[in-house]
């Protein structure tokens, strides 16, 4: 088992470093096949260990070496694989292996394939480090490196100015969250004296609640930035400037799920901070609703799918706010499969279009040209809409039901917000399907003449993920949601979640309402677009104003730039001008220099030849001499100290 754990970590590392150092000698063909093979082997090992954990739910630890040992603080590079970790590894390795295979076909004409595959493997490696660490320090190391790698991947096409700006936006927004992560780690180290999970979780109930609230607020802000929660979500749609395989990997199983994993791993602390749970619940509700509203007013294919990711991350956050950690984890796993399939299908569509346009208004009539892609994206969309029998139905609807089964006014309100978000999901999903495949062609003849299905490297991963999107939820539901299962219960702590209340006390109306609404809204969207053509005919100025606000992401970029970034820069400039180069500058080296220069100048003026200045200086020197003599006589000051001063004054007077 220890060898298996080592291989899960080592193989992606080899897949990253070999192309980095020997890619030019090995060639892009060998590199693409080698990296894909190593990640696939890692995936198979993960599935084997998942099977082992089902029968024997005992975590396995791997201790490497000590990093820091200061007084009572002991930090080690230790790794642990438990049920929570293996679930994350299932999503990470499965999606990463599919993305590697997909990239062989998608990036076949790119001249920098070696660098691209090395970065993909690097991303996978550091994400594995993040989830397998047995303490917050190792988690933080992986956290920082996936932020760096995301910058390198989003800005992969370095000649595109927008790609570079988007990557910078993503990394700066994440650095804001990282600052709070560091704050949380410092408080944890101060309060608990360690960063190890086992010690922290075992003693959390002994710690003052205010300190626990401070810790979890800091960690939650870090998770908000990484998982694109409302208020820190601006970077998410901008990250679509990277290649489509990057979008598939980032938004399905790696970067955006890191924040959710951090909250799940900290569940044992969260249970003692009901205030933070309430905040998490409402931030998740605002996130899922705002993402849906923005998505229905967007027209960029990849950005709509990215906003759907934000919406589903909000659903996971709602589940965490309800203390339903197993529901959040199950939805994270299921969402990884159909979201990766959505992005890959979008990439297949973009790849088949001659000018690689991403505006769905320029599509239409592609059903007969891309039937295989149509089937895959339809399966993924229906799973996202939580249609019965598909993975999303088993992972998503139970979260919406749980909000109604918690017996509080706040949770009832969140139920209707989550329900509205589910309806909006149907709206933008059907919008993609209709404008891409069902509507009349909206492009030129040459585009449709050259439209074609992609090669086997692109279609094979889509087929495999389509299988997962259909059956993974049904196969795994008893493992994660079954009444008698304890697969993840020993590693996360759902003390406040009322599973039986959710299952048996809610009326069928509230259980079936999201499903019925999804079906009716889907039919309504098709009918309205087909027979009434309202999409481009909304000429009312008030409707256009509302549409424009949501199309601009609730003008969040403008608010961020004007009220936070601009004001922050002005404030920083004023502080630098008045404090750093003002008070400190004058009291520091420059002030001392000027003081000494002025004193020297005044001493030099004592030798002036004018009668008035000579009289004044003589009077001052006389007063000084008398004062010094009084010090010697009255206060018993050593005369040896006074003699040099007297000699200097007399020399200045008679020079």
From Swiss-Prot:
Q: Where in the cell is it found?
A: Mitochondrion inner membrane
Entry function:
Core subunit of the mitochondrial membrane respiratory chain NADH dehydrogenase (Complex I) that is believed to belong to the minimal assembly required for catalysis. Complex I functions in the transfer of electrons from NADH to the respiratory chain. The immediate electron acceptor for the enzyme is believed to be ubiquinone.
Q: What is this protein called?
A: NADH-ubiquinone oxidoreductase chain 5
**Database matches in PANTHER family:** NADH-UBIQUINONE OXIDOREDUCTASE CHAIN 5
Share what the entry says about its subunit structure, partners included.
Answer: Complex I is composed of 37 different subunits.
Enzyme class, UniProt record, top EC level: translocase
What's its catalytic activity?
a ubiquinone + NADH + 5 H(+)(in) = a ubiquinol + NAD(+) + 4 H(+)(out)
EC number, UniProt record: 7.1.1.2
Bilayer topology reads:
Multi-pass membrane protein
An annotated GO cellular component: mitochondrial inner membrane
**Which organism was this protein described from?**
Yarrowia lipolytica (strain CLIB 122 / E 150) (Yeast)
List where the protein spans the membrane. Answer: 3-23, 34-54, 84-104, 116-136, 137-157, 180-200, 204-224, 244-264, 276-296, 304-322, 332-354, 370-390, 413-433, 456-476, 516-536, 629-649
State the similarity comment: Belongs to the complex I subunit 5 family.
Q: Which GO terms describe its molecular function?
A: NADH dehydrogenase (ubiquinone) activity
Name of the gene: ND5
User: What are the UniProt keywords, alphabetically?
Assistant: Electron transport, Membrane, Mitochondrion, Mitochondrion inner membrane, NAD, Respiratory chain, Translocase, Transmembrane, Transmembrane helix, Transport, Ubiquinone
**Gene Ontology biological process:** ATP synthesis coupled electron transport; electron transport coupled proton transport
């Amino acid at each position: 088992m220890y060898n298996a754990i080592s291989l899960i970590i080592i193989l992606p590392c080899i897949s990253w470093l070999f192309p980095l150092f020997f890619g030019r000698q090995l060639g892009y063909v060998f590199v693409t096949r080698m990296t894909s093979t190593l990640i696939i082997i890692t995936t198979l090992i993960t599935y084997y260990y998942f099977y082992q954990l089902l029968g024997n739910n005992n975590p396995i630890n791997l201790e490497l070496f000590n990093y820091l040992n200061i007084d009572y603080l002991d930090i080690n590079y230790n790794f642990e694989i438990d049920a929570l970790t293996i679930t994350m590894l299932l999503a990470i390795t499965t999606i990463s292996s599919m993305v590697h295979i997909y990239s062989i076909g998608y990036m076949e004409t790119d001249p920098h394939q070696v660098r691209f595959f090395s970065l993909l493997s690097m991303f996978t490696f550091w994400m594995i480090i993040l989830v397998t660490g047995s303490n917050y320090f190792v988690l933080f190391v992986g956290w920082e490196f996936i932020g760096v790698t995301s910058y390198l991947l989003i800005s992969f096409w370095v000649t595109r100015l927008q790609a570079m700006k988007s990557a910078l936006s993503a990394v700066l927004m994440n650095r804001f969250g990282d600052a709070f992560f560091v704050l949380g780690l410092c408080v944890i180290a101060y309060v608990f004296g360690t960063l190890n999970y086992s010690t922290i979780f075992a003693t959390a109930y002994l710690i003052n609640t205010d300190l626990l609230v401070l810790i979890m607020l800091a960690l939650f802000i870090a998770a908000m930035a990484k998982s694109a929660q409302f208020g820190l979500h601006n970077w998410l749609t901008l990250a679509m400037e990277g290649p489509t395989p990057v979008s598939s990997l980032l938004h399905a199983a790696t970067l955006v799920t890191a924040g959710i994993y951090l909250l799940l791993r900290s569940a044992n602390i969260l249970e003692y901070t009901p205030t933070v749970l309430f905040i998490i619940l409402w931030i998740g509700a605002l996130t899922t609703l705002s993402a849906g509203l923005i998505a229905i007013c967007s027209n960029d294919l990849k950005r709509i799918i990215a906003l759907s990711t934000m919406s589903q991350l909000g659903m996971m956050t709602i589940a965490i706010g309800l203390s339903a950690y197993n529901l959040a984890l199950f939805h994270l796993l299921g969402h990884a499969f159909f979201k990766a399939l959505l992005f890959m299908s979008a990439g297949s569509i973009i790849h088949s279009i001659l000018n690689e346009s991403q505006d769905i208004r320029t599509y239409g009539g592609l059903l007969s040209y891309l039937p295989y892609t149509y089937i895959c994206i339809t399966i993924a969309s229906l799973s996202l809409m939580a249609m019965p029998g598909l993975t999303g139905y088993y992972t998503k609807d139970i979260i919406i039901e749980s909000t109604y089964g918690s017996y509080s006014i706040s949770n009832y309100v969140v139920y209707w917000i989550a329900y509205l978000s589910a309806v909006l999901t149907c709206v933008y999903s059907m919008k993609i399907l209709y404008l891409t495949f069902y509507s009349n062609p909206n492009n030129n003849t040459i585009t449709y003449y050259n439209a074609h299905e992609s090669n086997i490297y692109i279609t094979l991963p889509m087929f495999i993920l389509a299988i997962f999107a259909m059956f993974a939820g049904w196969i795994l539901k008893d493992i994660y949601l079954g009444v008698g299962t304890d697969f993840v219960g020993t590693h996360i702590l759902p003390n406040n979640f009322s599973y039986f209340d959710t299952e048996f006390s809610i009326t069928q109306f509230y259980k079936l309402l999201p499903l019925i609404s999804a079906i009716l809204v889907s039919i309504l969207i098709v009918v309205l677009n087909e027979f009434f053509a309202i999409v481009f005919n909304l000429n009312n100025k008030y409707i256009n104003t509302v549409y424009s606000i949501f199309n601009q992401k609730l003008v969040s970029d403008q608010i961020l730039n004007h009220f936070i970034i601009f004001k922050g820069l002005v404030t920083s400039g004023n502080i630098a001008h008045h404090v750093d180069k003002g008070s400190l500058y004058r009291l520091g080296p420059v002030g001392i220099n000027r003081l000494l220069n002025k004193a020297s100048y005044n001493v030099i003026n004592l030798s002036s030849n004018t009668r008035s200045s000579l009289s004044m200086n003589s009077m001052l020197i006389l007063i000084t001499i008398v004062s010094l003599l009084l010090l010697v006589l009255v206060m018993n000051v050593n005369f040896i100290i006074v003699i040099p001063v007297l000699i200097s004054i007399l020399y200045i007077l008679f020079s």
